[in-house]
A protein has these predicted regions:
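Glycine-rich phosphate-binding loop of actin/hexokinase-like ATP-binding domains
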Residues: 153-258
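Catalytic phosphate/nucleotide-handling subdomain of diverse soluble enzymes
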Residues: 221, 226-262, 268, 332-363
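Phosphate/pyrophosphate-binding loops at sites that engage ATP/ADP/AMP, CoA/4′-phosphopantetheine
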Residues: 72-88, 193-200, 315-326
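A mobile "lid/hinge" subdomain adjacent to the ATP/sugar-phosphate binding pocket shared
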Residues: 259-303
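Internal helix-turn-beta structural module
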Residues: 301, 305-329, 335-400
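N-terminal glycine/serine-rich phosphate-binding loop of ATP-dependent small-molecule kinases
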Residues: 1-98
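Glycine-rich beta-strand-to-loop/alpha-helix junction loops that act as flexible
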Residues: 9, 92-96, 211, 325, ...
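Short beta-strand-loop/turn "lid" adjacent to the catalytic site in phosphate-handling enzymes
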Residues: 73, 77-125, 146, 153-161
């Protein structure tokens, strides 16, 4: 069954085409549409076994972008399917499912209405995610669609971990609480890591660290999300590329009063101007920070130490919450590729039973590999995340 997986952002569409069977999957093509709504847009199409294809032209909206993707998929030279009839379903990544969606679901009018109702608390992502669904209805009418939510995995978090100590009325009226994100990735790498280490996923204590430009840590207790570092929004928790992570709210309101900033300006500051970018005034990319760190830049040293240290703090917190830990898993763009980050986070965790294998860690990039010694009581691993495969699998299981 050929499944198209879409991740629609405000000005981009990431996609994969995967041929799914009961026990196997085969990637046929992947690519990205960028700069939607700007004077010059881009399509970069990468079919497996064929030469990549690029197209540069105005792409005014998501529907136009998806049409270009479908044209590329059926192109005689660059395509991977003969006709669009071969696309049996479309799976969508949706950032926020609120309390409505504890699992993936087939798209209905009610589902679309609930996604729309969450625009207020997910203004950066849900509108674009829904736009992808509506565009498919126009260009592939009648094709089953499935929504897979970043928040679903975290719907098992107990109230003691998801509630804020604010007046309860704000939860009752507005559902202000911790939701967590990156759930699709956390679930996949926890399951895959447990299998790699020979652990029983449903009878284990696993801490997953999804570290990229956005980053979060999750406690997975007996196969279910028990706590996670992101909160009501993805700005909470770790020090990230441009997001501040944990901060005293009074510090933010104080800055707002002093600078005469609106709520929208404060929100933009915390989301887009903070994190390692704000600390260094250099870059939001950890590769740039690493170079500046090696050159002795004091701000880069501070930013990297804060970034790594915050991850280590959450690992310790979640080990305490779960009464121990069996495995720590690293994933995400930085988690999969930064040997320095993994070593730094694990250094000092020997008291918890972590015996980190520095030799195994060297050069481990974009692979699935155990990074702890054979005798380590707590296993450590790096797992390459595959959110698209999870979306394709959920889509296949719902429509087959």
């Amino acid at each position: 069954m050929v499944i198209l997986v879409l991740n629609c952002g405000s000005s981009s569409i990431k996609y994969q085409v995967i041929d799914m069977e009961d026990a196997s999957s085969k990637l046929l093509a992947k690519g990205i549409v960028e700069r939607i709504g700007l004077p010059e847009g881009d399509l970069i199409h990468k079919p497996v076994g064929k030469q990549p294809f690029e197209l540069h032209r105005p792409i005014p909206d998501h529907t136009t972008g998806i049409k270009l993707v479908l044209d590329a998929l059926t192109d005689p030279e660059h395509g991977v399917i003969r006709s669009l009839d071969e696309v049996k379903a479309v799976g969508h990544r949706v950032a926020h499912g609120g309390e409505f969606f504890p699992e993936s679901c087939i798209v209905t009018e009610e589902v679309k209405s609930k996604i729309r109702s969450l625009f207020e608390i997910a203004p950066l992502h849900n509108p674009a995610n829904l736009e992808g669904v509506l565009s498919i209805e126009k260009v592939l009418p009648g094709t089953p669609q499935v929504t897979v939510f970043d928040t679903s995995f975290h719907q098992t978090i107990p109230a003691v971990n998801f509630m804020y100590a604010l007046p309860h009325a704000y939860y009752d009226k507005y559902r202000v609480r911790k939701y967590g994100f990156h759930g699709t990735s956390h679930k996949y790498v926890a399951q895959t890591g447990a299998k790699l280490a020979g652990l029983d996923f449903e009878n284990s204590k696993i801490i997953t660290c999804h570290i990229g430009n956005g980053a979060s840590v999750t406690a997975v207790l007996n196969g279910k999300s028990f706590d996670t570092s992101m909160g009501f929004s993805p700005v909470d928790g770790l020090v990230m590329g441009t997001r501040c992570g944990n901060v005293d709210p009074s510090a933010v309101t104080f800055i707002g009063e002093k600078e005469g900033m609106s709520y929208a300006e404060l929100n933009e500051m915390m989301n887009k101007k903070s994190g390692v970018l704000g600390l260094t005034d250099l870059s939001s990319d950890m590769r740039d920070i690493d170079l500046a760190y090696d050159e002795g830049n004091p701000r880069a040293i501070l930013a990297r130490d804060m970034h790594y240290g915050r991850i280590r703090k959450f690992v310790g917190e979640y080990a305490a919450e779960m009464g121990g830990v069996d495995m720590i898993v690293f994933t995400g763009g930085v988690g999969e590729n930064s040997c320095e980050m993994r070593e730094s986070v694990c250094t000092g965790l020997e008291f918890m039973g972590v015996e980190f294998d520095r030799e195994a860690n060297k050069g481990a990039r974009g692979v699935n590999k155990i990074l702890s010694t054979p005798g380590s009581r707590v296993k450590v691993a790096v797992i390459a995340t595959d959110e698209e495969l999870v979306i394709a699998t959920d889509t296949y299981n719902l429509v087959k």
